[in-house]
Curated annotation (Swiss-Prot):
Its main location: nucleus. This is RNA demethylase ALKBH5. Binds 1 Fe(2+) ion per subunit. The modification N-acetylalanine is found at A2. Phosphorylated at Ser-87 and Ser-325 in response to reactive oxygen species (ROS), promoting sumoylation and inactivation. Acetylated by KAT8 at Lys-235, promoting interaction with PSPC1, thereby facilitating recognition of N(6)-methyladenosine (m6A) mRNA by ALKBH5. Deacetylated at Lys-235 by HDAC7.
């Protein structure tokens, strides 16, 4: 049998079979080692490029991913801007609970006197969910000017607003002087902003050509927040995320200067006024601040020659709009949506829409009286105090 299989004896056949088994085992071990090496290489590649799909070569390395890089850049810019804002802010808690209560009682007296009509016309400025009371110096802003925008604000003539109440000097200003927050004699303008829940003030910069720096404010009645770098949208009102949200506590003093006062807007958001809140803003007007040269305006219609009578050298001050009524708002006024300047502009534009785009609630008589040819200046009937609105071509 051994001869038929080609082996001379059984020992040679056993030796031959052992050699083949060793060869096969070695081949299997080599194949396993090779497979392990390939798997290790793939794992290393996946670790190096975690966002790459299998078998797809990345076009950009991770560090140069455009979307990721843009997001990180925006975050870095926001953090840098927040750092600049913080560099221009000082905060301190100076007023105790008892001191706050005394000052808040005085603020209530101001509100009561205003409701009785005991202040000058330009001392009080009313808006839904927010009233302002100017003392020492007052100025025109926002809807009060026909020509709007930064740099158009003007101080009222001397005497058009009431003097700073003595209690503001004794209870507020003197304490700030004692703690060296402001120097003696710095303040000549005090404004009290009185907010109801949901009230707000849109993003703005205190007029640089009107007021010196710093700007000092003291908070009363409740806690809130002062936000920097927000953008407002209206109908419904919405506010973007701030660059910095600064908590302001009852009895705290906030001092703005530098970048925080001049290079970025600040605002009070509606969601940050959960309870009644008041703030006393103390400032100093610039010696070269522009001022209206005429006496206070009444709510009557201005004569056509009014503008020519208000020349001061080569400068013409923009005419004031008639002031709002000083009647007390009805009880439901605080619960209606706040009417802001962008809303008013949209309402004016809606009057000028063609017939097929107007709502059916407008009568033909109203349409006849409020329809004009494009490009013309339009106003109400003679004798109306309404401001002229220039139509836009669409």
């Amino acid at each position: 049998m051994a001869a038929a299989s080609g082996y001379t004896d059984l020992r040679e056949k056993l030796k031959s079979m052992t050699s083949r088994d060793n060869y096969k085992a070695g081949s299997r071990e080599a194949a396993a080692a090779a497979a392990a090496a390939v798997a290790a290489a793939a794992a290393a590649a996946a670790a190096a490029e975690p966002y790459a799909a299998p078998g797809v070569k990345r076009k950009y390395p991770e560090d140069s991913d455009p979307e990721r890089s843009d997001f990180e850049e925006q975050q870095l810019q926001k953090e840098e801007e927040a750092r600049k804002v913080k560099s221009g802010i000082r905060q301190m808690r100076l007023f105790s609970q008892d001191e706050c209560a005394k000052i808040e009682a005085r603020i209530d007296e101001v509100v009561s006197r205003a409701e009785k009509g005991l202040y000058n016309e330009h001392t009080v400025d009313r808006a839904p969910l927010r009233n302002k009371y100017f003392f020492g110096e007052g100025y025109t802003y926002g809807a009060q000017l026909q020509k709007r925008g930064p740099g158009q604000e003007r101080l009222y003539p001397p005497g058009d607003v009431d003097e700073i109440p003595e209690w503001v000097h004794q209870l507020v200003i003197q304490k700030l002087v004692e703690h060296r927050v402001i120097p003696e004699g710095f303040v000549n303008s005090a404004v009290i902003n009185d907010y109801q829940p949901g009230g707000c003030i849109v993003s703005h910069v205190d007029p640089i050509h009107i007021f010196e720096r710093p700007i000092v404010s003291v908070s009363f009645f409740s806690d809130s927040a002062l936000c920097f770098g927000c953008k407002f949208q209206f109908k419904p009102i919405r506010v973007s995320e701030p660059v910095l949200s600064l908590p302001v506590r009852r009895g705290s003093v906030t001092v703005l200067s530098g970048y925080a006062a001049d290079e970025i807007t600040h605002c009070i958001r509606p969601q940050d006024i959960k309870e009644r809140r008041a703030v006393i803003i103390l400032r100093k007007t610039r010696l070269d601040a522009p001022r209206l040269e005429t006496k206070s305006l009444s709510s009557s219609v201005l004569p056509p020659s009014y503008a020519s009578d208000r020349l001061s050298g080569n400068n013409r001050d923009p005419a004031l709009k008639p002031k709002r009524s000083h009647r007390k708002a009805d009880p439901d006024a605080a619960h209606r949506p706040r009417i802001l300047e962008m809303d008013k502009e949209e309402n004016r534009r809606s009057v000028l829409l063609p017939a097929h785009r107007r709502a059916g609630r407008f009568s033909s008589e109203n349409y006849r009286r409020k329809s004009y040819e494009p490009g013309e200046d339009c106003s109400e009937a003679a004798g109306s105090p309404a401001r002229k609105v220039k139509m836009r071509r669409h």
